[in-house]
Amino acid sequence: MAPKKAEEVVESPPVSSEEEESGSSGEESESSAEVPKKVESSQKPESDSEGESESESSSGPEPESEPAKTIKLKPVGTKPIPETSGSAATVPESSTAKRPLKEAAPEAIKKQKTSDTEHVKKPITNDEVKKISSEDAKKMFQRLFSETDEIALLQGIIDFTSTKGDPYEDIDAFCIYVKKLIDFDATKNQIVTKLQRLKKKFNNAVKNSLKKGKTEDDIEFAKDLEQKGFELSRKIWGSNGVLVTGKSSRKKVGGTPAPKEMKLVAHSTPKKQQEEAKKPERTEAKVVNTGLSIGKEIASFLNADNGSSCGLDESTLTAVWAKVADGAEKREVEEKWKKLKAKQFELCLQRSGLVNETAKMIFKAYES
């Protein structure tokens, strides 16, 4: 059995040299230094094996040993090669294995950033936009003063005028007084604009009723709160309202001064024309003022023509007129006064135009 092991070692060098020649140039450089050593060591057993083979040639048959040599040479020759190639190949594998880790780090960061941005920037749907727009529209057109606030505001005007006076003269104190009665913290401008709208609403309701042939007593509303608000507005801005009678009593007797054009006519015309022009000037100048009450209109008319012979002043006439029952007849008289004032305005405009024409003619005659 010993000679068979020796024969296996003898034929290993030639097989390894053939595989090294077919390999890469880098492996040939590394294996070239090791091959001579193996060849030298392998040559010694060849001599021994040759002697043993000669001695055994007579004893054993040769053809049985040759196929055993060829079968076992391939694994013996290939054993040192994978060790060198494996050691050389493991180095680049370790270097290349680290690179995907470095490249994977920024990719993971990018994924985190994209996931964060997707989480933050959510797309807004059409339903959400409609909800937002509807909420904004409700806030824009939301009613500040409720119906109960309007009634409290009107009642506050009546109470304030009875205790402290006209709210328009001391509007700051009135706003402080009314804020306690309203459910929200209203500003001064909001309160003033609301008063103007309530007054306009009352006047429009009265005008519409008069067009239909009805009086203030006949005006009715479907809701109880609206009816109550109208009754309070009537106490404030009606013919016998607190603010209407208060304004008339606070004004002085006499109207606005006559226009300058009227004075020019008086100085430029002859005596007869002066006498005819003076009488209507006084009466019309007194009556044209739209802010006057009916009592003051009558007082100014009587005092303009008769002086103090009647013994009637503005306060007594306004007080007596306030006692007149509020009804259809009283409303008709007030409407007639309004129409008369409108006609007086038209007459005043016509007269001013006539004055301008006469003044131009006088000026031309004076220059010539």
From Swiss-Prot:
UniProt keyword annotations, A-Z: Nucleus
Acidic residues bias spans: 17-31
Any one Gene Ontology cellular component term annotated for this protein: nucleolus
Biased composition (Polar residues): 84-97
Molecular functions (GO terms): transcription cis-regulatory region binding
A Pfam family matched in the record: GeBP-like_DBD
Comp. bias (Basic and acidic residues): 35-47, 100-123
GO biological process, one term: regulation of DNA-templated transcription
Segments of this protein annotated with the region Disordered: 1-123
Source species, domain of life: Eukaryota
Compartments, as annotated in UniProt: Nucleus
Keyword Nucleus belongs to the record: yes
Annotated PANTHER family: BNAANNG10740D PROTEIN-RELATED, GLABROUS1 ENHANCER-BINDING PROTEIN-LIKE
Family to which this protein belongs: Belongs to the GeBP family.
Subunit text: Mono-, di- and oligomers. Associated with the Mediator complex. Interacts with MED6. Interacts with MED10A, MED28 and MED32. Interacts with DEK3.
Function: Transcription factor that binds promoters containing the CryR2 element, 5'-ACATAWCT-3'. The DNA-binding activity is decreased upon direct physical interaction with the mediator subunits and is modulated by redox conditions. The oxidized protein is the preferential binding form.
Protein name: GLABROUS1 enhancer-binding protein-like
Gene this chain is encoded by: GEBPL
